Amino acid sequence: MGERATGQRPSAPPSLDLEVRVRLAHARIAHLLDRAGIRGLHLKGYATEPGVYPEHRRSSDVDLLVHPADAAAVIELLRSHGWEPVAAFSEGSIFQHAATLWHDQLGYVDVHRLFPGLGASPEAAFDALWSEHAHLVIAGRPVPVPSPRHQRLVVIVHAARDPFRGGLDVRHIRESLPAESWAALREEAHRLHAGAAWHVATGEAADGVDTRQLTLFAALHESQSGLELFRTRWQSAATVRERAVLVARTIPVNRPHLQMRLGRPVTRADLWREQRARLGALAGWAWTKAVRRDR
């Protein structure tokens, strides 16, 4: 169910049924992390209690949230047990929040070092979710998952970046909860600094919400991309340093993104053509901005 910004494709799909392999992957990963003494929370999909999603929803991968300090160790642990890197953190979304790995029998896992829109910091978000985590038996093994209320909050926060299925998920949660439970969930969203994502996903009042985050999540909800999204991120940046980092991350071509778009392996000519187009678009935007400022 997670976002995947990669064009790499396995040479052959796993022989197992999709649901079976995803459930087995949850159990296997939980076993590996438990044996290594590393905390990890399984998010969304089959790692939720009945009723969180509409009926008959299927999942295509494992979403695993770990403490940022453990992210590198988790990647290495999975690599040592048959998972191969597909996209690094820097090659994923604009938040650089997840790395994707592939296992020939168990399929994809997205390792999250943060959950965009949730928490004052990645560390605070993980600690808040872990502080009241529960266990859900998946493929015969207890798997660490957020509490029932946090399961729903994670789905709603994610919906701010997924306007299609996410909208259905939010509507389902809202309609399936009593009014007082929905109000309590809203309060929890604000307590965990998820007000911007909550507003964008639910359309409810945005009182007291960080306007920069609100602008960014609204752009993602509207499926902005390319130069349009760059403009929004530039306007949302609070400091010169943030804008410098934005430019530095925007200029290099994201190979997995490009491969996904092309549907084939990327060549040097593809990279050069994409790089030239990207630099040209940024130069044109900078020129237009300078001309407007001088008027």
Where are the model-predicted features located?
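Conserved NTP-donor binding/palm subdomain of two-metal-ion nucleotidyltransferases/polymerases, i.e.
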Residues: 1-60, 66-295
